[in-house]
């Protein structure tokens, strides 16, 4: 997994909230999770391509949830080579760190959208339009759950 632009996962406190982002050009999925319980939940999807409204919405989420850190999914091909979106996701992670001063950690997001789509279909969301509305938030949840399962502190 690539190096994170902020502190290492060990630098996170044992307790606190994390927000995770599944970055895309048209949508950003957002999930929330807790370090203590090590559970992630889909939160919402930010729509639109303009940077200013996206960061304004993220600022509101940070104010509401008061996270101790942020996680950004980093795409790569199955063989681990960088994806076309890797540089854009890394730039987004750096912007989050620069704007908000929180630790921003990267997490491998390979196949998270495919896993989210499969989970939604299995849960009974068969209409593709309905799945599309929540797909990115569920992908962010999968990214954050993977991060919580593979990094940081031992389960209480």
Curated annotation (Swiss-Prot):
Q: Which GO terms describe its biological process?
A: rRNA 5'-end processing
Q: Which UniProt keywords apply?
A: Cytoplasm, Hydrolase, Nuclease, Ribosome biogenesis
**Which EC number(s) are documented for this chain?**
3.1.-.-
Q: Pfam families per the record?
A: RuvX (PF03652)
**Statement: the UniProt record of this protein carries the keyword Nuclease:** yes
Gene3D superfamilies given for it? Answer: YqgF/RNase H-like domain
Where the protein is mainly located, per its record? cytoplasm
Name assigned to this protein? Putative pre-16S rRNA nuclease
Q: Which organism is it from?
A: Aromatoleum aromaticum (strain DSM 19018 / LMG 30748 / EbN1) (Azoarcus sp. (strain EbN1))
Q: What taxonomic lineage is listed for the species of origin?
A: Bacteria, Pseudomonadati, Pseudomonadota, Betaproteobacteria, Rhodocyclales
């Amino acid at each position: 997994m690539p190096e994170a632009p902020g502190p290492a996962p060990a630098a996170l406190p044992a307790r606190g909230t994390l927000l995770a982002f599944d970055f895309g050009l048209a949508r950003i999925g957002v999930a929330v999770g807790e370090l203590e319980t090590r559970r992630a939940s889909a939160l919402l999807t930010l729509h639109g391509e303009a940077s200013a409204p996206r960061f304004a919405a993220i600022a509101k989420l940070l104010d509401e949830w008061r996270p101790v850190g942020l996680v950004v999914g980093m795409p790569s091909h199955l063989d681990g080579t960088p994806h076309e979106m890797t540089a854009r996701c890394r730039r987004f992670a750096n912007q989050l760190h620069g704007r908000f001063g929180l630790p921003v950690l990267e997490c491998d997001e390979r196949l998270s959208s495919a896993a989210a789509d499969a989970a939604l279909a299995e849960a009974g969301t068969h209409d593709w339009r309905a799945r599309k509305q929540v797909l990115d938030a569920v992908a962010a949840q999968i990214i954050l759950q993977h991060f919580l399962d593979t990094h940081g502190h031992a389960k209480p």
